[in-house]
């Protein structure tokens, strides 16, 4: 529709590669085939950081950069891992574009992926308030040959929100489209620790702005033996990983919230009069994060944790996960 047309606007796709030669061409081709220019008037640029590949990935990147010099650029980085790689891409991303998106190296994007995200970002935009906006969608799980596999585990039962983000990440990084405000906030104070880069962006947007989770699936999320992070397709492995998340990752989640609180203080110090960081709703959310950190683990804090559950409505998406989470939170194991 004409109302969504944005002449001369640009979206920059940020991709991190590491030993990705097997599926990289298919991924890049699907990005180049996006219809955001035709549907939205928004041009596309692809900016790639290689994280020290040793399988010839760089040759493929050279090939595409030479063939599409106006659309694709890349640079060689040291091996620092996927989280730091994406935050470095944020640091080096183009200041002048309006939208940003993350990309993995081994998926397949449906042609409407970016235009769907841009359209929703525009729908969420309040031009009187500069707030961080994040769009993400449900990933379609596929095998190495892009054949659909069991997708029950990608379905979300509840809404996206900060009360969910403090204990669970539902944002798959490669489905993200964000506005410049969210990118700027992440760039200003990158975290010293986060469980995963996409989880950090979920926390930022759900605390200070808006998140839209699209149940439509615009990305084929490839599952194979070498992808660094992905969903597990084995039900047994899925259950074991769920238990592991509750038992092992709870400390990382608390550590992540502590870092989130630290950076909130930096935002306030830099812009003490900015109502984006200093309003009743944000203060309520930060207080929730603070209480989860302060009253974790020790048995004597069980009454406090009961009160937190009652007054805040913290939740996980899946019913079984929510029950297990509440039990371990109240028992003092969290």
Regions found by a protein language model. Name each.
Residues 1-234:
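Nucleotide-sugar donor-binding/catalytic module of glycosyltransferases
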Residues 222-334:
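C-terminal subregions of glycosyltransferases and related glycan-biosynthesis enzymes
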């Amino acid at each position: 529709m004409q109302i969504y047309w944005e002449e001369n606007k640009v979206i920059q796709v940020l991709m991190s590669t590491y030993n990705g030669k097997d599926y990289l061409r298919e991924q890049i081709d699907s990005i180049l085939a996006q219809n955001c220019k035709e549907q939205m008037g928004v041009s596309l640029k692809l900016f790639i950081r290689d994280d020290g590949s040793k399988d010839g990935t760089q040759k493929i990147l050279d090939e595409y950069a030479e063939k599409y010099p106006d659309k694709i650029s890349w640079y060689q980085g040291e091996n620092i891992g996927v989280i730091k790689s994406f935050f470095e891409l944020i640091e080096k991303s183009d200041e002048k574009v309006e939208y940003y998106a993350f990309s993995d190296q081994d998926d397949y994007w449906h042609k409407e992926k970016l235009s769907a995200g841009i359209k929703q970002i525009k729908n969420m935009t309040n031009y009187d308030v500069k707030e961080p906006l994040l769009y993400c969608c449900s990933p379609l799980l596929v095998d190495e040959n892009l054949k659909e596999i069991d997708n029950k585990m990608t379905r979300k039962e509840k809404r996206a929100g900060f009360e969910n983000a403090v204990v669970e990440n539902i944002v798959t990084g490669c489905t993200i489209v964000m506005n410049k405000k969210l990118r700027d906030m992440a760039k200003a104070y990158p975290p010293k620790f986060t469980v995963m880069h996409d989880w950090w962006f979920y926390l930022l947007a759900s605390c200070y702005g808006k998140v839209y989770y699209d149940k439509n699936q615009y990305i084929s999320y490839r599952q194979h033996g070498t992808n660094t992070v992905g969903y597990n397709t084995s039900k047994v492995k899925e259950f074991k990983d769920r238990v592991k998340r509750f038992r092992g990752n709870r400390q990382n989640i608390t550590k992540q919230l502590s870092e989130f609180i630290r950076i909130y203080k930096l935002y306030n110090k830099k812009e003490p009069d900015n109502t984006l960081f200093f309003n009743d709703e944000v203060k309520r959310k930060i207080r929730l994060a603070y209480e989860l950190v302060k009253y974790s683990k020790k048995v004597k804090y069980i009454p406090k944790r009961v009160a937190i559950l009652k007054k805040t409505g913290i939740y996980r998406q899946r019913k079984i996960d929510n029950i297990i989470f509440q039990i371990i939170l109240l028992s003092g194991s969290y």
